[in-house]
Amino acid sequence: MRHTLFISDLHLEEETPSITAHFLYFLKHQAPKADAIYILGDFFEAWIGDDNQTPFNRKIIESLQTLARTKPTYFMRGNRDFLIGQRFAAMTGVSLLEDPSVIQLYNKPVLLMHGDSLCTLDHKHQAYRRKIMKPWVQKLMLSLPLSLRRKLAKKFREQSRRHNRTLSYGIKDVTPEEVNRVMKEQNVELLIHGHTHRPAIHDLTINGNPTKRIVLGAWHHGGSVLRYAQDGSFELQAFKIDL
C-alpha cells in the first residue's frame, strides 16, 4: 500500500558510524518504497553552517541528493541543526519546512513539529530557543569563522548534556496544555513530532473530538521510522541491522 515515512532525531555525526550505517540502509531499502519522506529535525547532532563541507557532511548531503532525485523529501530543522539553510536545500534537493507546518497527508491535515517548543516546562531551553531562532542571531553566528563555530557547538552540546541531567522526567517531556493549544490553533486531529526521544502513540481528546499525537523515536542503537499508509493506518517501526 502507498505510504509516507517520517523520521527524526538521528543526531548524525562522524563519531557514530553505526547510526550512519542504519540511515544509509534506510535510504536503500525503505525510502524508495515510500511516496515521500519527512525528516523532522535533529537530523545532525550539530550543524554549524552550510559552508562546513567536511567529508562526512558531503557523504550525507550526497545520500540525501540521491534520495531527493526520486522521492519528495522534506526537512524540518531541529534545535541541533537550526543553522541549516537554503544552500543545504539546494545541494540536497530537499524542501525545507517551517516549524510548525500543516501538511495534507492523503487528504488529511496533519501538524508536523520538531517538538522542542512543546516542552514549555523546560524554561532554560525555551529561553535558548527564543534566542537562536532570531534571524539576526543566526546571521551573526554564521558570520563567525568555522573554527570558532566548532568550538561554540561543542560548548553548547556539553552545556545541553549537563542541563538535561538536572531535569526531571516530566520537565523533559511536552506539556499537555501546549499540545492542546497548538492542535486547537492549527485545527488538526493528528500531530507528529520528535525531540523527546520517547516514541509512542498518544490518544487525546480535544474539544470533544478524538485526536492523536505520534512521537517519533531517536536513532540510538538502530533506526526508528513512522510508516503512515494511504488508508490512515500507521505504525512506529524500529529496525536494527548487522554491522
UniProtKB/Swiss-Prot annotation:
Mn(2+) 1 binds at D9, H11, D42, H197. One of its GO terms (biological process) is lipid A biosynthetic process. It is an enzyme of class 3 (hydrolase). Its EC number is 3.6.1.54. Substrate binds at N79, R80, D122, S160, N164, H195. Its cofactor is Mn(2+). Mn(2+) 2 binds at D42, N79, H114, H195. Its main location: membrane. Keywords: Cell inner membrane, Cell membrane, Hydrolase, Lipid A biosynthesis, Lipid biosynthesis, Lipid metabolism, Manganese, Membrane, Metal-binding. NCBIfam families: lipid_A_lpxH, PRK05340.1. Hydrolyzes the pyrophosphate bond of UDP-2,3-diacylglucosamine to yield 2,3-diacylglucosamine 1-phosphate (lipid X) and UMP by catalyzing the attack of water at the alpha-P atom. Involved in the biosynthesis of lipid A, a phosphorylated glycolipid that anchors the lipopolysaccharide to the outer membrane of the cell. This is UDP-2,3-diacylglucosamine hydrolase. The gene is lpxH.
